[in-house]
Structures are given as C-alpha cells and as structure tokens.
Amino acid sequence: MVCQTCKCENTKSSFLIRDYEYDFSSVSEYSICKSCNLIYRTHNINDEKANLLYSKKVYKPVKGGFLYDNLKKLNAYYEKYHLIRKVFKSKDKKKIVILDIACGKGYLLEAFAKYKKYICFGVDINYIPDRENIKFIKTDFKNLNIIKDINADIIIINNFIEHIEDINDLYKIINIMKQGSNMIIITPDTDSNARLFFGFCWSGYHAPRHKILFNKNNILKTFSHIKEVNLKTSKLYDPFTNLISYSNLIKEFRVNFSIKLLLKIIITPLLLLMDLLNKNRILMIIEKK
C-alpha cells in the first residue's frame, strides 16, 4: 500500500497490533513509511465493517459509561481552554457556529454549548439525542451537503482524522469551507514518549480502528499541497490515553509473560505523566484563506 502523505511505496518496518480494547484475538498489520514516517494500517476497512466497529452498542465514545464519561468531560474542558486561546479568541463574531465531525457523545461540544455565543452541531454515524444548544445529525462525515448547509466557522476533527480510510475525503471538506473558517484537528502524536515506552501496547494504535497516525512533520506535509489554507501546529496533553496504554500492557502481560513487561507494569504508575512536557497529542489549525 502507498503512503497517503508522500506516496512512497517503501516501508521501514511492518508489525501486528492487537485490538486490546475490544477483541484481543484480532490483529491488524501496520507499516511505517520509509520516507515520512507516517504509520498506517496496511488494509482498508469497508463501510459494513466500520458500522460494526463503531456501533453504539459497543464503541465507548458513543456508548459511554460513568467513569469514561467523566474522564472525557474533564479532558474536554482542557481542550476547550486551548481552543479558545489559540483559535476562538481571534473570532470577534457575536455568534460562532461550531461543527464537530464524528462527535461521539459530544463531550467537547457540551463544553462549548453552555455559552450562548456558540451554536453547536455534531455529526456522527450513530443517533445521538439533541441537547441544549446542540443539534446532532445522524449521517456519515462524507455527507458534504450537510456540512455545506451548516456553514460552520469552526470545524472540529477531534481524534477522528486517524480513523479516515482515505484522506481525500477530508480534503473535500476543506474545499467547501468558507473563507476565514478554521478546521481544528486533534490526533495522537507518534513521536510521543508514550509510544516509545508502551510499544505495541500504545493506545494510539487503537487497532484496527486507526488507519493513519502522524507526527508534527508528516501531518504538515499531508496538507501542505493545499494552497488556499494557512497551517499551524502545536501540542496538547491527554493523560487518559496513557491509562488505556497501561491497561493494554496488563492484558498483554497476562498472555505473554516477560520480565520486560513486568518491569513496565511496575514503573508505569510513576510515569503516567510522562508526556506532560513533551505532550502526546497534535493540535493542528487549518485556516481557510
């Protein structure tokens, strides 16, 4: 398979990743591009398979749960703070229309919806009941007519770009964005300390759901050919992903005992904040000229 970012056909390495969170027996192959270091799943997932993987009955971001919901809400306030500081602060409009694509239960939207300045929309393949100041629309993210009708000032792609099978589908959304609007992308960083430490148990793989995984350099390269946009990147911290990685590590240890895994399990509680300085999420802002 060709790298979607640089079109290189050569790879540094290929490896198998378990589906630690949902089906331990399932494995998917990933490769690292020899040219740009993009990590990508080597096979595609069709729509039928995707509907099963992201079903509201099983998939945590839409199914939720008491602990999961509260952790995600807490993280959403941290994300909102950074988005207001880096993007929304420059918007002097009385009303700002926000569209969150593949929004799940709408944790981040809910943080904005408390303020009447923001008019909030969420798009997801699962049905999500409307909440105060949030209109949820059950549709695929490829439904360009819906996106065009909403005509958002801010489009949020929060932990979703890595799920997209064909990056051209995201380019199509950028093409219909209005002048002066922004697309905000939040995604795992393959250069994080957590990936180096947890290895194949790193939650950023989220196999087989994650298709493409970026670092700051290759995500800029992915969008650099689009002339009518300005690109900026920075970093965010998400401590809860390291908790998932720790859980994955324990699951792996139960079936594949090794001293190395045992030592990692012992010292991980001391290192859960290992990405506090380096941070483990990429925040990209795409401004339409």
PLM region descriptions:
Residues 1-150, 154-158, 170-171, 234-236, ...:
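Conserved N-terminal segment of class I S-adenosyl-L-methionine
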Residues 16-25, 233-289:
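A C-terminal cap/extension of S-adenosyl-L-methionine-dependent methyltransferases
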Residues 59-66, 198-207, 246-253:
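Short glycine/proline- and charge-enriched loop/turn segments
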Residues 120, 228-229:
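Hydrophobic anchor at the start of a short beta-strand
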Residues 159-163:
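A short His-aromatic
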Residues 164-173, 187:
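A short, conserved alpha-helix within the catalytic core of class I
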Residues 177-183:
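Short glycine-dipeptide loop
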Residues 186-212, 217-221:
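Short, glycine-/aromatic-enriched active-site segment of Class I SAM-dependent methyltransferases
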